[in-house]
Design a protein with these regions (language model features):
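Jelly-roll (double-stranded beta-helix
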Residues: 1-324
Length: 324
């Protein structure tokens, strides 16, 4: 999914509350994806106060939306550098095409992982039969040593595990007997946990990881701290478990990883290490793809998409700052 904000350099501050239980609550902000009929996502990362959770650098939560009347999701070919996109659906179906020749469907319970590395472009379109769209779009920042790898695409279907009465589908890393062999370049975990009403579970954690818990549905408390729907709870490294309770049927997404220990420059759909990196990526996208000068350049060509690629926004008038 592309970041379609008109001013992607501006990370609008939303409140972050540190509770007595050392659970930091990050509020979402609404971001429209495209025109007036387009769907709106709820973004909890990045924020001014927090840019990364391990390597996770971008969290969009959307739906459940009835997209039958709006035309659904239609994101034209757009570029990425220095990151991995992690697509995970709860409802609906999305058609993915990219410049390394991949054509795949994103379905509930199945992972689509695209590694941009030195550069890739892709499109995302909800399928004609999709009436409701509901899920998360996540990005992982690649470590500096790996950020220029050749681009590639993977599809995985995790086997379900369990924690007490809760079901677990771990799409990155491993947790509670569930996991995939998805290729990542720093230690990470990503899992969907579905809980029945009136239950409490103890989720095992990697002590060296920092973690985030996104609440999709339910009356959820984390270590006794209420976390509203679409909000993100942040937890520092040093924990070995996490107590999650809900009075109603609940779904959460657990994300974690070793602190990246690096600063990144993130603008629009690019991640680099300097202002100059991003300026160069934008110029190449505009020159190679939008102007049609070199369809076999850094970002390649998305075959099979009926439409034109997405132009990059104008760069801000100030230098882009590293965050981390």
């Amino acid at each position: 999914m592309s970041n379609l904000e008109r001013d992607p350099a501006e990370l609008v501050a939303t409140s972050a509350v540190l509770t007595d239980a050392d659970v930091e609550i990050l509020e979402p902000r609404d971001v429209p994806l495209g025109g007036p009929r387009a769907m709106t996502v709820r973004r909890t990362l990045p924020q001014r106060r927090r840019s990364l959770i391990g390597g996770w650098c971008f969290i969009d939560h959307y739906g459940p939306d009835d997209v039958s009347a709006t035309g659904g999701m239609r994101v034209p070919p757009h570029p990425h550098t220095g990151l991995q996109t992690v697509s995970w659906l709860f409802e609906g179906e999305i058609d993915h095409r990219d410049s390394v020749g991949s054509h795949a469907l994103v379905r509930p319970g199945e992972l689509n992982l695209m590694t941009a590395g030195r550069g890739i472009s892709h499109s995302e379109v909800s399928t004609p039969g999709t009436r409701r769209l509901h899920g998360v779009q996540l990005w992982v920042a690649l470590p500096n040593a790996s950020r220029d790898v050749e681009p590639f695409f993977e599809h995985h279907t995790p086997v379900a595990g369990s924690i007490g009465p809760a079901s677990v589908r771990t799409f990155v890393g491993s947790l509670a007997g569930s996991g995939t062999s998805a290729t990542v370049f720093s230690p990470l975990v990503g899992a969907e946990i579905v809980m029945p009403a009136d239950t409490t579970i103890e989720v095992p954690l990697e002590e060296g990881f920092e973690h985030g818990v996104l609440v999709d549905a339910g009356d959820v408390t984390i270590d006794g701290t209420p976390v509203p729907v679409s909000h993100l709870a942040y937890l520092n490294p040093g924990r070995t478990s996490l107590s999650v309770s809900s009075g109603a049927d609940a779904r959460i997404v657990l994300l974690g990883g070793e602190p990246l220990g690096e600063q990144i420059v993130m603008w629009w759909n690019f991640i680099g290490r300097s202002h100059e990196d991003v300026v160069a990526y934008r110029a190449q996208w505009q020159g190679e793809v939008i102007a049609g000068a070199d369809p076999h350049g850094r970002f390649g060509t998305v075959e099979g998409y009926d439409g034109t690629p997405l132009p990059a926004p104008e760069l801000p008038s100030v230098r882009l700052r590293p965050r981390g």
